[in-house]
């Protein structure tokens, strides 16, 4: 599949979230997304001011796309396209999350994400 015909990261995330809302309903797993998309894209004065305020409020650059909490343990899932690479901020966040005792994975497709979540025991 050519890169142009493969799904965007956002499309994979939407597909995964729709699926997880079905399979995790009432299962004692909390999952959510951190709204930090486009943090590096603020170019106008208003955008920079908003980004600065969000950072002061605790928004953290590089946070994984999906966060899961199950039985007191945190799991972070970063979604990428086939040849996608983590940003410097994402690599820093990954190291910090692992150092804090969380599990972290980078996945490259819907199926890859489902397999990782099964391996973690988030879904069966």
Where are these regions (language model features)?
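Catalytic phosphate/metal-binding cores of nucleic-acid and nucleotide-processing enzymes, i.e., regions
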Residues: 1-124
